Amino acid sequence: VSKKNYPVEATEWILQNLDVKNIKLFNEYNYGSYLLYKGVPVFIDSRADLYAPEFNGKRAENGEYDGRDIFTDFIKTSSMERYYEDTFEKYDITHIILKKKSKLNTFISNDSGFLEMYNDDNFVVYERCK
């Protein structure tokens, strides 16, 4: 597994230092499956269809689904089309793991509402301070 593309060391740190049963982790799409495989609950992974409203809600009489559109929320948050704090509040996110070079990390790394807990050459883990 490539440590450049997957948060190998960050995942080990999370498993050793955080109570994974009691965190809500926002992660990026590309390595969500790796986190999940290692036993870390994720916001999203490569099974994008499972994060559409059709798979996490009920169908209303009008044919619309009432589930959350987690995939769209992820895309809009990661691209900064939506203010990240709105998404984090909506899903009660407690921790964030990001690639250091991500657009979202550029903003969060300068936001006093987040405490950097871990970083390595490629990834960073934050705690969201409410």
Show where each model-derived region lies.
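Extracytoplasmic
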Residues: V1-K130
